[in-house]
Design a protein with these regions (language model features):
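Conserved PLP-enzyme active-site core in the AAT-like
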Residues: 54-177
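Short, solvent-exposed polar/charged micro-motifs at secondary-structure junctions
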Residues: 9-12, 114-116
Length: 177
């Protein structure tokens, strides 16, 4: 629902002023910015994932886009697991190039190649565990060690793992999808 009903223009303006001062404070004036339902969902997911905060997006592609674009700028590089979710590959192989952001893919069973792929421009290692297309499991502990050693941020798509089986934030990942 994108329309939120108010009794008067005065009420809308009050709510909008509060939302500007505190964007996550539960002041709803338009559904795209969140509703009581989305904020409750975010609070529940934050507890399930045992994380600091959760943002919901309308699609998985939106979540991947947000995770990557929040830490990269033109000229940066990311490294992604080869068997990523096909829309993630679409994003990395097509859209990131438009922004001069390079993606290198690594074999999830060859972490030496992953480490050799890291450059001074590498900002993110993007992991899926298990991999969407192949269900490959990776040594995420080793990946985290490599990332920390090189001071590279990490993101993991945990769609298949869910917080029931895996809690990536507790393990040390910087971002969870």
């Amino acid at each position: 629902a994108s329309t939120i009903i108010f009794k008067s223009m005065k009420d809308i303006r009050k709510t909008q002023a509060k939302a500007i001062k505190n964007p996550t404070g539960g002041h709803y004036d338009y559904g795209r910015q969140g509703t009581s339902t989305t904020y409750i969902l975010q609070k529940i997911l934050t507890k399930l994932e045992e994380s600091y905060h959760v943002f919901t997006t309308p699609t998985g592609f939106g979540a991947v886009f947000l995770a990557i674009f929040s830490v990269t700028r033109p000229g940066d590089e990311i490294i992604a697991a080869d068997p990523v979710y096909s829309p993630t590959r679409l994003l990395t192989e097509n859209f990131l190039k438009e922004f001069n952001i390079k993606t290198t893919f690594y074999n999830p069973h060859d972490l030496k190649t992953l480490e050799k792929s890291i450059t001074k421009k590498t900002k993110l290692i993007f992991v899926e565990n298990p991999g969407s297309n192949s269900f490959d499991f990776q040594d995420i502990g080793k990946i985290l060690s490599i990332a920390k050693k090189h001071k590279v941020l990490t993101a993991i798509d945990n769609t298949w793992g869910t917080p029931y089986f895996l809690k990536p934030i507790k393990l040390g990942f910087d971002c969870l999808l």
